């Protein structure tokens, strides 16, 4: 690693995206944010679509800026959210904008699918928890409606691959993102075409699956020239953002659980093979593809969504609480005994989150500080419950919980979580998704041998904080 290598990660979320530049030099890894851009769905004729042109322009602005600064890139990688896709026409053009998973057009579709493929059979094949917006339900809904983009499509590309296509003109289907679609047989790690054909879904539009680390191709000649970067290769990283984040967990061995903490919390373990049985289905666990052939066995938990929605209510009331202020408020009511179930469907999309919580606890006299304390304690308790479930499935003893993502910066919640679960919580890195993206590019370039070397380098490069149970937390 004596030569300096530079990689660019585009990390795109459902509301915003950013680009981060990773530098490897002399065995040291560093990272800096290059740009940040909004990502908002478009509403057309009552439908929600992703604004692919806007995202592409943001990519181009970033690449052009790097080129003007004389920065030479070894490669580029892209990660995004899962399930959504775009259709490519036979002439290689975009057949239509990709629909956004927030569009309610798949409401009620799973029940229609189960009339053809029973729920238990679908889970047994794919290992994916049932959610209305899973790709399989989107494709069924579009097929049934005679969607013109899908009807004329020669291929479909999931969002990371679609964005890579805008830069390279090459079409691939990356494994980790495909694994979340609800269409992939988790045992064969290929699309279950027999199942899809029973639903009338076209299988000729599905591309062969490639593994993370596959080089997709160089930037298109006109983009290479326009940006001044030259023919930089674009690499298929772990395209699903959670897969990239889990790749960046700074663990020393397999005996860990992870919590990717943000608006939603994703808690799981990394295992060598899918865990698919009646217990995992009943508990609504999902199996998603990880790097190096691993499986991310996990559960979706409502995360900071509860607090974010309360903040919106309070802001409209003229109370603009900062996050540090919210932490102080919760700490001041640490002994407050009230609890809610964060995953209760009543909290999915209430008109007023504060009022919904008050109704749930049956006490409309709660102060704002007590509500915040209730949310934090309830999340910590829910993490304990799910961790206990995970231990029942894990082929090893879970010894620590790694918290990654934006929520890992919340020291009070980390401490209360450690107290609740009775084991150490290792917090950080915050930018796990982008770091995982960059590390997989470095692995593709031959700078890193495997995920454990990757994790050792991350551990040495980014500070983490360890929270042990029952420690003093009044700092």
Predicted features along the sequence, with ranges:
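Active-site core segments that coordinate phosphate-bearing ligands/cofactors
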Residues: 2, 8-9, 21, 107, ...
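Glycine-rich beta-strand-to-loop/alpha-helix junction loops that act as flexible
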Residues: 79-82, 212-213, 261-264, 400-408
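N-terminal glycine/serine-rich phosphate-binding loop of ATP-dependent small-molecule kinases
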Residues: 1-96, 124, 152, 224-234, ...
């Amino acid at each position: 690693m004596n030569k300096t290598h530079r990689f660019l990660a585009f990390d795109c979320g459902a509301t915003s995206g950013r680009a981060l530049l990773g530098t490897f030099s002399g065995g040291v890894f560093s990272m800096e944010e290059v740009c940040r851009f909004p990502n908002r769905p478009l509403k057309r004729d009552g439908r929600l679509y992703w604004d692919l042109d806007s995202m592409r322009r943001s990519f181009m602005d970033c690449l052009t800026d790097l080129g003007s600064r004389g920065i030479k890139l070894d490669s580029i990688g892209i990660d995004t959210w899962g399930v959504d896709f775009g259709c490519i026409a036979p002439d290689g053009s975009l057949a239509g904008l990709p629909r956004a998973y927030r569009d309610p057009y798949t409401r009620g579709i799973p029940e229609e699918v189960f009339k053809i493929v029973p729920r238990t059979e679908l889970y047994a094949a794919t290992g994916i928890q049932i959610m209305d917006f899973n790709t399989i339900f989107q494709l069924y809904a579009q097929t049934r409606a005679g969607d013109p983009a899908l009807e004329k499509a020669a291929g479909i590309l999931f969002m990371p691959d679609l964005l890579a296509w805008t830069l390279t003109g090459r079409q691939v289907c990356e494994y980790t993102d495909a694994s979340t679609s609800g269409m992939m047989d988790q045992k064969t790690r290929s699309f279950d075409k027999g199942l899809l054909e029973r639903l009338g879904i076209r299988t000729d539009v599905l591309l062969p699956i490639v593994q993370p680390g596959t080089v997709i191709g160089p930037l298109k000649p006109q983009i290479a020239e326009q940006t001044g970067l030259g023919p930089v290769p674009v690499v298929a990283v772990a395209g699903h953002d959670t897969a990239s984040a889990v790749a960046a967990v700074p663990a020393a061995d397999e005996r860990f659980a992870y919590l990717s903490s943000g608006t939603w919390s994703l808690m799981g373990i990394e295992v060598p093979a899918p865990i698919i049985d009646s217990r995992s289905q009943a508990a609504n666990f999902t199996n998603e593809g990880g790097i190096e052939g691993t499986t991310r066995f996990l559960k979706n938990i409502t995360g900071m969504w509860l607090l974010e929605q309360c903040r919106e209510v309070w802001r409209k009331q003229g109370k603009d609480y900062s996050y540090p202020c919210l932490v102080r408020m919760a700490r001041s009511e640490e002994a407050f005994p009230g609890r809610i179930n964060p995953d209760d469907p009543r909290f999915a999309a209430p008109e007023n989150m504060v009022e919904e919580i008050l109704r749930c606890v049956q006490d409309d006299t709660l102060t704002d500080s007590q509500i915040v304390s209730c949310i934090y304690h309830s999340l910590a308790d829910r993490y304990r419950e799910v961790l206990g479930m995970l231990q029942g499935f894990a082929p090893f003893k879970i010894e620590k919980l790694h918290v990654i993502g934006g929520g890992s910066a919340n020291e009070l919640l980390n401490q209360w979580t450690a107290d609740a679960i009775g084991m150490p919580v290792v917090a950080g890195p915050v930018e796990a998704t982008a770091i995982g993206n960059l590390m997989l590019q470095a692995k593709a370039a031959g700078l890193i041998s495997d995920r454990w070397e990757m994790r050792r380098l991350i551990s040495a490069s980014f500070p983490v904080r360890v929270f042990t149970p029952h420690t003093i937390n009044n700092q």
